[in-house]
Each structure stands twice: as C-alpha cells, then as structure tokens.
C-alpha cells in the first residue's frame, strides 16, 4: 500500500491515491488539477522515504472535486453575573480534493487507475429459494 504525508493549510494529512479528502480552501475551480510539493513522507510497499523536512522529487497530483463548507461551530462567550453574552457561528470553507497520483523522482508509485484495478470486487452472496426455510 502506497501513501504519503503532505502538508497543506498548516496541517499534515496522510493521503492515498484514489481517495478524496476535505482540506482548507484552495484557489482554483472545480475540475482543476493541483500539484502538491510539500511532501513530508512517502511509503511504498515497505520502502519509506522521510524528508528533512521535505522529500526531494516527491509530487502529489490531485483534482478539485468541489468547494464546500464544513459543519457549523458555535462560539459562545459569557461573563457571569454581568448579563453579557455573545453567540457566534463559524463554518470553515473547504475543498474536496481527489488524489490522482503519488510520484517520486518522476516515477509514479500509485495512481487513481492503479488503485481502481487493485481493489478486489466485493463478493455478493446469492440467495436462492432452496436455501430459505419457512417457519409455520
């Protein structure tokens, strides 16, 4: 399994190809491709590359799926015995980013197409009339 740890919006995030993540707002519109160079760690089948502070030659490519707003956070301030109360709400602007590929030194380690091929199909159990029993 290949994954990387990136830094975006002042936060560190573990990402894998073929998954989407909600991160702080990025400039760009829906469908734009984004390249992230702030890669702190890359792991590929037991081979770990740790940056000091960044991994040289590592690149994460993704596509902006949509812009959205996070859950509302209520900020409530109160001074006891003074009848002073303030209630404010805040919703963080977010970007949903689909990770397309993880590459190191020009070699693609994981991509969206590879992750779709590698996932096994879910087994569906078939129910036939012979296996059902009626209770009287």
Curated annotation (Swiss-Prot):
Q: What's any one GO cellular component for it?
A: cytoplasm
Signal sequence bounds: none
Example of a GO MF term: rRNA binding
Q: Where are the transmembrane segments?
A: none
| GO term, biological process aspect, one | translation
Q: Which InterPro entries match?
A: bL21-like, bL21-like_sf, Ribosomal_bL21, Ribosomal_bL21_CS
Q: Which domain of life is it from?
A: Bacteria
Q: Which UniProt keywords apply?
A: Ribonucleoprotein, Ribosomal protein, RNA-binding, rRNA-binding
The record's subunit annotation is: Part of the 50S ribosomal subunit. Contacts protein L20.
Tell me the PANTHER family matching this sequence.
Answer: 50S RIBOSOMAL PROTEIN L21, LARGE RIBOSOMAL SUBUNIT PROTEIN BL21M
Question: What NCBIfam families does the entry give?
Answer: L21 (TIGR00061)
In which family does this protein belong, per the annotation? Belongs to the bacterial ribosomal protein bL21 family.
The record's function comment reads: This protein binds to 23S rRNA in the presence of protein L20.
Please give the name of this protein: Large ribosomal subunit protein bL21
């Amino acid at each position: 399994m290949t994954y990387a740890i990136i830094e975006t919006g002042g936060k560190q995030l573990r990402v894998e190809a073929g998954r989407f993540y909600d991160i702080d707002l990025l400039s760009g519109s829906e469908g734009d491709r984004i390249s992230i160079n702030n890669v702190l760690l890359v792991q590929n089948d037991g081979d770990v590359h740790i940056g000091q502070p960044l991994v040289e030659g590592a690149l994460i490519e993704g596509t902006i799926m949509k812009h959205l707003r996070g859950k509302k956070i209520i900020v409530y301030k109160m001074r006891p015995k003074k009848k002073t109360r303030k209630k404010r709400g805040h919703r963080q602007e977010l970007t949903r980013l689909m990770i397309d590929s993880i590459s190191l030194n020009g070699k693609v380690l994981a991509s969206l197409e590879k992750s779709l091929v590698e996932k096994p199909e879910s087994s569906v159990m078939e129910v036939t009339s012979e296996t059902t029993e009626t209770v009287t």
